[in-house]
Amino acid sequence: MIYKVYYQETKIRNPKREDTKSLYMEADSDVIVRQLVEENTPYNIEYVQLLDEKHLAYEQEHADFTLTEF
């Protein structure tokens, strides 16, 4: 399953919508995705979204789609 993770680059500052970034990860569950991101980055995770087939196709066509691996 492919997940889209919305995050802020730092946990120190208050989150701002304009600074939200995203990355894509393949994993068996959102819990695993959250663990991997928390263990390997200083990011403040806002939301972990499971991408369905249509949403994934859209992201692959229209976004800077790259799977992140740790």
Swiss-Prot record:
GO cellular component: DNA-directed RNA polymerase complex
An example Gene Ontology molecular-function term: DNA-directed RNA polymerase activity
Subunit composition and interactions: RNAP is composed of a core of 2 alpha, a beta and a beta' subunit. The core is associated with a delta subunit, and at least one of epsilon or omega. When a sigma factor is associated with the core the holoenzyme is formed, which can initiate transcription.
Protein name, per record: DNA-directed RNA polymerase subunit epsilon
Gene: rpoY
Superkingdom assignment: Bacteria
Transmembrane regions: none
EC number of the protein: 2.7.7.6
Gene3D superfamilies from the UniProt entry: RNAP, epsilon subunit-like (3.10.20.730)
Summary of the function given for this chain in its UniProt record: A non-essential component of RNA polymerase (RNAP).
